[in-house]
Regions:
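A short acidic/basic microdomain associated with nuclease active sites
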Residues: 76-102, 107-111
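Well-ordered, non-membrane alpha-helical segments in soluble/globular domains
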Residues: 31-44, 135-156, 187-208
Length: 256
């Protein structure tokens, strides 16, 4: 895949390095906007968990994938139109021809800028001090996420809300970390090299993922503030968000 170009966005003490979009497709621009705003809100809410005076350092990106939900759900709620539903059945269409879904549920359902979004989320940790590609965890989970979104494509046509279409969106949060305490110089090297690191990861996902449509369409990193980088004997310099937005699916007319 072609490498992304990046630029820095800063707001309210939050610094994000994000890929730049150049698309004439409305759905892609809307997907980019929700991702961009989501990562800012993710960072804002994560920073609220940093309370040194109360000895509270329960930063969600330090833990497992399920802990991310405690930040992603309210972040989506803050930026989307109306309610964000979690663990939503893929098929909700009421029809004379009852269709039984074998695909289960999607992690999130929401409406943003006139589009329905069905979202799958994964989370991984990646040691930024290692040169090896993240074959087992990151690539395997990315491939599973793309597979799940491919499986619900036909079901998305049957969603009954009156929107411009349904955008399937895959979110993969990658927490950069090391079980070592590095110097500030090494953290700065991470920040300076994050563009290259993101492109290497995205290229690996596009190349190694055997599932159709596996190439990422968005990549960004939240550069964690200096005061939050170190925790006990570990270093957390950033949280990456790598995402895939599929072309919007138009609703089928009701057959009722």
């Amino acid at each position: 895949m072609d490498p992304f170009s990046f630029r820095t966005f800063s707001k309210d003490g939050i610094e994000i390095r994000s890929s730049i979009i150049d698309s004439k497709d409305e759905y892609m621009n809307v997907a980019y906007e929700i991702l961009h705003r989501l990562l800012f809100q993710f960072a804002k809410l994560s920073m609220k968990a940093y309370r040194p005076r109360k000895n509270a350092y329960n930063l969600p990106y330090m833990y497992s994938e399920r802990r991310l939900d405690s930040v992603v759900t309210p972040a989506l709620s803050d930026i989307c139109d109306g309610l964000v539903l979690t663990e939503m059945p893929a098929v909700r269409k009421k029809s004379k021809k009852r269709i039984k879904s074998k695909h289960g549920r999607v992690d999130y359902w929401c409406i943003f800028k006139g589009y329905t979004f069905v979202i799958e989320m994964k989370g991984s940790h990646d040691r930024f001090d290692c040169e090896t590609v993240r074959e087992y965890s990151l690539i395997r989970r990315w491939g599973k996420m793309i597979e799940q979104l491919n499986e619900v494509a036909e079901d998305c046509e049957l969603m009954e809300e009156k929107t411009k279409g349904v955008i399937r969106l895959g979110l993969h949060f990658v927490s950069s970390w090391s079980p070592k305490v590095f110097s500030n110089k090494r953290v700065e090297e991470y920040r300076e090299g994050c563009d290259c690191d993101l492109n290497v990861i995205c290229d690996s996902l596009a190349t190694c993922c055997n599932t159709a449509g596996g190439a990422p369409t968005y990549a960004a990193v939240w550069l964690i503030p200096d005061k939050m980088v170190y925790w006990k004997d570990a270093t957390y310099p950033g949280v990456m968000l790598i995402a895939k937005a599929f072309e919007d699916i138009k609703h089928k007319p009701s057959d009722e």
